[in-house]
Amino acid sequence: MAYPLQLGFQDAVSPIMEELLYFHDHTLMIVFLISSLVLYIITLMLTTKLTHTNTMNAQEVETVWTILPAIILILIALPSLRILYMMDEINNPSLTVKTMGHQWYWSYEYTDYEDLNFDSYMVPTSDLKPGDLRLLEVDNRVVLPMDVTVRMLISSEDVLHSWAVPSLGLKTDAIPGRLNQTTLMSTRPGLFYGQCSEICGSNHSFMPIVLELVPLQTFEKWTASLL
């Protein structure tokens, strides 16, 4: 989860989020090197007393500033495309959960089980217990097994929403009349928080998401207790 004054991303708990963090560092390094080079050139231009007014043609320079940016763009595009394909790839999910956005709560349905569905509302500030997080706690958490591939089907009953859990690298739009899908897999158990990330009305800020990732045996006991 996020902390006050945090400047970086949340800790990654999924392979996709780890790849996104690596890509962020990779891209940031390239941007830093380019910015340093530009600043160095500007400094030289402002401090040097040498002038050259007879330059009419510089074929070598034009070649360099054409080829070098192309190489840099390729170095950015290749890992980006790799991650995009990884995020879209869905192979034999072990569990499917359907998520519907409403104004202003989420509803969940475990499609592999009969009659296993519930609504998830934010817990009001007046009902919070010691240790609970304001504006992030819900009355019904989404319990999922860790170390397995889970497919999320996401849509909306009314207006545009967006189902986002940053620590898992997830952000998928919930669009009325359209069913979007994404996958998640957590490498460790715990509670992971998210929120609606598409402005959807006056109570947009009060649509938290809480995923509780547990071992498979614990998940099976939880489902058995509800059926």
From Swiss-Prot:
PANTHER family listed in its UniProt record: CYTOCHROME C OXIDASE SUBUNIT 2, CYTOCHROME C OXIDASE, SUBUNIT II
Cofactor binding summary note: Binds a dinuclear copper A center per subunit.
Taxonomic lineage of the native organism: Eukaryota, Metazoa, Chordata, Craniata, Vertebrata
Quaternary structure and partners: Component of the cytochrome c oxidase (complex IV, CIV), a multisubunit enzyme composed of 14 subunits. The complex is composed of a catalytic core of 3 subunits MT-CO1, MT-CO2 and MT-CO3, encoded in the mitochondrial DNA, and 11 supernumerary subunits COX4I, COX5A, COX5B, COX6A, COX6B, COX6C, COX7A, COX7B, COX7C, COX8 and NDUFA4, which are encoded in the nuclear genome.
Cell location: Mitochondrion inner membrane
Keywords, comma-separated and alphabetical: Copper, Electron transport, Magnesium, Membrane, Metal-binding, Mitochondrion, Mitochondrion inner membrane, Respiratory chain, Translocase, Transmembrane, Transmembrane helix, Transport
One Gene Ontology term, aspect cellular component: respiratory chain complex IV
Main location as per UniProt: mitochondrion
Membrane spanning residue stretches: 15-45, 60-87
EC top class named in words: translocase
Mitochondrial intermembrane compartment spans: 1-14, 88-227
GO annotation terms (biological process): ATP synthesis coupled electron transport
Binding site for Cu cation A2: 196, 198, 200, 204
Single Gene Ontology MF annotation: cytochrome-c oxidase activity
List of residues binding Cu cation A1: 161, 196, 200, 207
Protein name: Cytochrome c oxidase subunit 2
EC number, as in UniProt: 7.1.1.9
InterPro entries: CcO_II, CcO_II-like_C, CcO_II_C, Copper_CuA, Cupredoxin, Cyt_c_oxidase_su2, Cyt_c_oxidase_su2_TM_dom, Cyt_c_oxidase_su2_TM_sf
CC cofactor: Cu cation
